[in-house]
Amino acid sequence: MRRLIILAEVALGLLFASCTKEEQRTLSVIPAPLKVELQQEVFSLNSETGLYIDASEGDKKILEDYLVASSMNLKPVIAEEGHNVVLKQVAELPEVNSSEGYVLTVTPDQVLIRATSGAGLFYGVHSLLRVV
């Protein structure tokens, strides 16, 4: 009888040990984003994907060199429209409370990174490279 109880305890222990939580999708971005909204839509990088940067000339050159040298293989373009990765330095972002913060938005047609500084754009690009 004692063996039967021990066997039952072991069986229950194995049963509970084999149960796992549902896998959660996480992003390996450091520092962790304040907010993440995962969508079903995806942006597909291809040979036609361009890079448009709307920032100061100094920041633009640094960001362009960094992204062109990356594994994303982007080609600079002169228009924001199209299947592009777009970096925009804007005057203000109400949802961001840091000069180095950024907003990264992905749609099937475009990847848009907005920030109020070159540093914010750089960190946005770094996050993009981490999730690609």
Where are the predicted features?
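Bacterial Sec-dependent N-terminal signal peptides
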Residues: 1-28
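Acidic, contiguous N-terminal accessory segments
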Residues: 19-132
